[in-house]
């Protein structure tokens, strides 16, 4: 099963010291009674009431940290930020977001604090909360962003499209008086329906085909 592969990969990364085990680690599993449970420490809690729909055969529910490494941004020292391409590209928020792929920033830093690895989904955790993009290169991210880096068997583009459906949920969870924001704990509680890899690929083909047709229609109207 795909989820077992991603869990095994995560455990190996923890053993190698490349990532740390979450102190509030949560695991979703299906019980013998066909109900879904969330394992928190030594406690198993039924979560059937939280699930919005029934999954197709072969799919399973999981929480986001089971299939991706989540890295919350942290701004580097202001004196290390420059406009002369020294160091690594730096992004504070969504200024250089596009419809999907991240544009280059005009700022860099020589002392990066938090790195979003190549092929990460970038999530705005400060207003406007829930905006998403994909980076095809490693970048430094500030406090306005989180990096969601999928494990080997999860497609970043599929994750990008699926997370779009959570924008309303994330905004509902956002708090703050001047600028609303969401915490790491909120991001880590996102429930994901996980299809087999082949079905991820089929979903992506369908989505990209639809967008291609929409693009052709828009061009014909201009």
What are these regions (language model features)?
Residues 1-44:
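Extended, domain-scale alpha-helical bundle/helix-rich regions
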Residues 1-12, 169, 186-222:
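Amphipathic alpha-helical coiled-coil/heptad-repeat segments
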Residues 12-19, 73, 77, 172, ...:
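Intrinsically disordered or highly flexible coil/loop and linker segments, enriched in small
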Residues 44-50, 65-80, 87-118, 136, ...:
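Sequence-specific dsDNA recognition surfaces
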Residues 45-74, 197-205, 210-222:
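Non-catalytic DNA-recognition/assembly elements of restriction-modification systems
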Residues 57, 89, 180:
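Residues that recognize and position ribonucleotide moieties
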Residues 63-71, 96-97, 118, 131-194:
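Basic, amphipathic alpha-helical recognition segments used for DNA target recognition
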Residues 123-124:
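A generic structural signal for residues embedded in beta-strands
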């Amino acid at each position: 099963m795909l989820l077992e592969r991603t869990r095994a990969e995560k455990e190996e990364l923890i053993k190698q010291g490349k990532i740390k085990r979450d102190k509030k680690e949560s695991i979703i599993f299906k019980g013998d009674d066909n109900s879904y449970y969330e394992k928190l420490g030594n406690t198993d809690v039924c979560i059937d009431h939280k699930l919005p729909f029934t999954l197709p055969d072969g799919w399973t529910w999981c929480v986001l940290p089971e299939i991706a490494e989540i890295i919350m941004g942290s701004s580097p020292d202001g004196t290390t930020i420059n406009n002369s391409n020294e160091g690594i590209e730096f992004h504070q928020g969504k200024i250089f977001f596009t419809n999907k792929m991240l544009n280059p920033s005009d700022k860099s830093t020589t002392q990066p604090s938090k790195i979003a690895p190549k092929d990460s989904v970038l999530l705005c955790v400060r207003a406007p909360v829930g905006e998403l993009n994909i980076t095809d290169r490693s970048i430094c991210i500030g406090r306005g962003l989180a990096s969601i880096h999928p494990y080997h068997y999860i497609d970043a583009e599929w994750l990008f499209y699926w997370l779009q459906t959570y924008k309303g949920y994330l905004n509902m969870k956002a708090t703050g008086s001047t600028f609303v924001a969401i915490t790491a704990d909120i991001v880590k509680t996102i429930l994901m329906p996980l299809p087999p890899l082949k079905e991820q690929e089929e979903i992506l083909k369908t989505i990209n085909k639809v967008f291609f047709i929409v693009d052709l229609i828009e061009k014909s109207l201009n």
